[in-house]
Amino acid sequence: MINDIRRINITTSSIESLNENSKYLKRNHKRTIKICAYAITTFALFFIVVVYFKNQTNVNDANRNTLAAIDETSLMNKEIAYLREILKKYKTKTNENNEYAYEKNDDINGDGEDEHELLLMLHKFLKNKGNPNKIDRFDINNNDSNKNRGNENIDQINILSQKLESMHDNIKYASKFFKYMKEYNKKYKNIDEQLVRFENFKTNYMKVKKHNEMVGKNGITYVQKVNQFSDFSKEELDSYFKKLLPIPHNLKTKHVVPLKTHLDDNKIKPKEGVLDYPEQRDYREWNILLPPKDQGMCGSCWAFASVGNYEALFAKKYSILPISFSEQQVVDCSSDNFGCDGGHPFLSFLYFLNNGVCFGDNYEYKAHDDFFCLSYRCAYRSKLKKIGNAYPYELIMSLNEVGPITVNVGVSDEFVLYSGGIFDGTCASELNHSVLLVGYGKVKRSLVFEDSHTNVDSNLIKNYKENIKDSDDDYLYYWIIRNSWSSTWGEGGYIRIKRNKLGDDVFCGIGIDVFFPIL
């Protein structure tokens, strides 16, 4: 042990060298710690900086989006504010010509709920109409958008300008549309359907206005107005007026009695000529007609015409006030007809012949088909003996010797919009509607709107008289027809249609299909 110790030669210089090495190792250790600390600090600072700038970018984007949203909201608010201002101004316009009730907005005034709905509907309408492709808003991060931003902004300004220019007219039509909805109790599923109906209404309204400006010119002797069909499209109207069912020849041969045979059987001697009969005949003055009924959205005109004919002749025969009989019974129970999908008055009379018809109170009208025939409800059934018919040249004779008769007509868009006067417009080429012929007459052209049943605006009558020429003040001949579209349509539910002096010109198809019940 001692020898080993002796082998170690320890000097002062060796000890100093060892001390230096120890210090060097300590310094390296501290340097490593510092480097690690600096690295960690640098990484932390870098991370903080990255996070900061990322957050700042998100904040900028959010602010930009917020500003854009605020800009869009401001634009919408400006539009709505403009609409409100126009609505207020429009309400004060009371000096415009009043073609009919929709020129004034009294019902809209003060109705906050309706005004809000009006603005909502119109705002959506204007956005869809003025910008159908939904032009995207300007995006500052989109290079393509940046490149064309000037053009896009100009386009958007032009679009907005066009919107603002058309707002006055649209707010005017929209306010009329809301009054129309109230009057006819129109209910729509959603705002999209309401917009479609608004467009249909606006089209028909402009058509009516254009027609009424021409009344008195070019021989036009009737006026139009919007009614329960004015929110229909042309396709819907064509679908509503269905072609009348054909009559099997064998049934017609078996059950129909010609007019002259019927008169001979009842020992009635008719006049020798049509001109021997009175110049006027109006069964509205005889107290044998009920007020015009309303078939609604059911294609049951054939039932209303035939039942109305039966009611009138029943009252005339027994000299009593008219009693209402059941259209719904015929709609549900007449298997030869197709209910609300169409029929024919002859087939309706054939049902009366075999089964009778009950009072309306026992079998009330629903304006739709029932799955079952509920004729057990009928406490009393009145039958007829035979079915009569007449030729076109016998219409005036029929009205005088029999009474009201059922005829079929060809209804057109112009016919539907009729409001008053003597209709001389275009008719459909096919018979598609059944009505009750209740009289005929004649009138001087200048006095067309002086009829007691006419309720035409005085301004229209004034314009009509200014437009006709004194040299053209001849006599006009017409039929009086009761429709089944309620008493709000036409002249209290009636229409006057032009005819020639003898009544055999079959205008609008009147005279082609003529039937009446023989009690």
Curated annotation (Swiss-Prot):
Enzyme Commission numbers on file: 3.4.22.-
Enzyme class: hydrolase
GO CC, alphabetical: membrane
Molecular-function GO term, any one: cysteine-type peptidase activity
InterPro entries: Papain-like_cys_pep_sf, Pept_asp_AS, Pept_cys_AS, Pept_his_AS, Peptidase_C1A, Peptidase_C1A_C, Peptidase_C1A_papain-like, Prot_inhib_I29
Record topological domains on the Cytoplasmic side: 1-32
GO BP annotation list: entry into host cell by a symbiont-containing vacuole; proteolysis
Disulfide-bonded cysteines: C298-C340, C333-C373, C358-C378, C427-C508
Location of this chain's protein in the cell: Membrane
Entry's family note: Belongs to the peptidase C1 family.
Protein name: Berghepain-1
Organism of this sequence: Plasmodium berghei (strain Anka)
Species classification: Eukaryota, Sar, Alveolata, Apicomplexa, Aconoidasida
Gene: BP1
